[in-house]
Structures are given as structure tokens and as C-alpha cells.
Design a protein with these regions (language model features):
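Generic structural "secondary-structure junction" signal
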Residues: 10-12, 26, 55, 76, ...
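Membrane-interface starts of transmembrane alpha-helices
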Residues: 54, 58-62
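C-terminal peripheral helix-coil segments that are non-catalytic and often amphipathic
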Residues: 34, 38, 42-50, 63-109
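Amphipathic alpha-helical packing segments from all-alpha helical-bundle domains
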Residues: 1-9, 13-15, 23-50, 93
């Protein structure tokens, strides 16, 4: 999971050193966040083709979804300088809220 302490430490390091080690930072980005977004985009495109979602741009939809379900938790973990993450119940509540907002925007009417 992206908010595990070891992953947070690696993300902080790579972000901090991206200017000095751009190839390493890019490799991480392409291997983790970018791959996840590409997978989500493919899923959303498929759901759009089946008439289940209204998706004009699957890549934008993937970014919206990822930030809605993870953005608040990840920002808190990254900026607070602590490896303490939210409780599982809080993470689930935020993810559920993100899914509701996503479906409100993308559900086929």
C-alpha cells in the first residue's frame, strides 16, 4: 500500500532527489504510480464501452479516482513528517467517500 511507512520514506527520498537523480525518480514513477493509473484508465475505458460509466478521457478519470480515494491520506502522510498512518476505518471512510464522488461524476445516467 502506498501509505506504508517504507513506501512513504522512499517517495519522500525520490521526490527530494528528483532533480539530482531524475532517471531513478522517473523509473519509480513509471513502475508504480503511472502503471497503476494506466491500469485504472484501461478499466474505466472498458466500463465506459460497456455503458456503465460516462468516460470521455480514461486517463483523466483514472487520476480523478486515484486522488479522490487516496489524495487526502497520502498528502497527510507525506507532509506531516510522520510514518503514522490513518486508522483502517478512517482510510475506508475516505475511500468510500471518494468512490461516491467519482460515481456521482462518472456514472452513466
Amino acid at each position: 500500500m502506498v501509505i506504508q511507512p517504507q513506501v512513504l520514506q522512499l517517495r519522500r527520498l525520490l521526490i527530494g532527489e528528483a532533480g539530482r537523480l531524475p532517471k531513478l525518480s522517473r523509473a519509480y514513477y513509471e513502475g508504480a504510480p503511472e502503471r497503476t493509473l494506466a491500469t485504472l484508465a484501461a478499466c474505466f475505458q472498458h466500463l465506459g464501452e460497456r455503458g456503465l460509466l460516462r468516460v470521455d478521457d480514461p486517463r483523466i478519470a483514472a487520476n480523478h479516482f486515484a486522488f479522490l480515494i487516496l489524495g487526502m491520506s497520502l498528502d497527510r502522510a507525506m507532509f506531516c513528517g510522520t510514518d503514522k498512518t490513518l486508522a483502517a476505518a478512517d482510510l475506508e471512510r475516505l475511500a468510500d467517500a471518494g468512490v461516491r464522488v467519482f460515481l456521482a461524476a462518472y456514472r452513466q445516467t
